[in-house]
Design a protein with these regions (language model features):
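Internal, hydrophobic beta-strand segments that form the core of beta-sheet-rich folds
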Residues: 164-165
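Bacterial N-terminal signal peptides
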Residues: 8-18
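Surface-exposed strand-loop-strand hairpins of Gram-negative outer-membrane beta-barrel proteins
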Residues: 33-54, 139-140
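Sec/Tat signal peptide C-region and signal peptidase I cleavage site
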Residues: 19-23
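Extracellular loop and loop/strand-boundary signature of outer-membrane beta-barrel proteins
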Residues: 40-43, 78-84, 130-136, 171-176
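Gram-negative and organellar
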Residues: 32-34, 130-134, 144
Length: 196
């Protein structure tokens, strides 16, 4: 009696997994963005400015819900307080909701957590046993991320996505004029879809 029940349970599980796999989507994106931040004060500068190359991916696995990862960094170093080169990096892992809007468009909403890594460059190398040698010191901050975009499909799989992301960075205001940064940009992407 146990073998038929096990067989039926296995068949049902296989059927459920097969139908879940039917509605999967994996996306890769590359783009460029600009960053704005709170206005400078008499003693602190803004984190805004510069071009930010971006990379992202997401995996939608249940009714257009899924998880994603985004990374953005300033392409060229900026100068901190008039003398020290620095470069910000933003990383986040998100929950993603991407419902279709007809045949050639798809909305994308995301919210998640991550980190901002501020790299302050020095004129000398610092070497460590496990880290090797680097010419920068990092200041890392926890962040929350909220974003949105609109995927406009130019083919079945290729899309262009205007996007905006708001970063709420914990303790960033110790070094810059505020704890908020907003990234606006455009990405191109490719969708690997198992359904249409």
């Amino acid at each position: 009696m146990k073998k038929p029940a096990l067989f039926v349970a296995s068949f049902c599980l296989l059927f459920l997994l097969g139908s879940a796999a039917h509605a999967q989507q994996f996306d890769l994106t590359f783009g460029v963005s600009g960053l704005t931040g709170d206005a400078s004060t008499a003693t602190l500068q803004t984190i805004g400015g510069g071009a930010y190359p971006t990379f992202g991916m997401d995996f939608l696995f249940y009714h257009h819900l899924g998880v994603g990862f985004n990374a953005a960094f300033r392409a060229k170093q900026n100068i901190f307080q008039g003398f020290q080169p620095f470069r910000p990096f933003f990383y986040d892992v998100d929950a993603v909701y991407a419902p279709p809007l007809g045949k050639h468009a798809q909305a994308e909403l995301s919210a998640g957590i991550g980190a901002e890594s501020l790299r302050f460059y020095t004129p000398f190398l610092t070497c460590g046993t496990f880290t090797g040698c680097t010419n920068f010191v990092s200041s890392n901050h926890f962040l929350g991320q909220f974003g949105g975009g609109l995927r406009l499909y130019v083919t079945r799989s290729f899309f262009i996505r205007p996007e905006a992301h708001v970063y709420l960075v914990h303790n960033q205001d110790a070094q810059f004029s505020g704890s908020r940064a907003t990234r606006f940009g455009v990405s191109i992407g490719y969708s690997f879809k198992s359904y249409e």
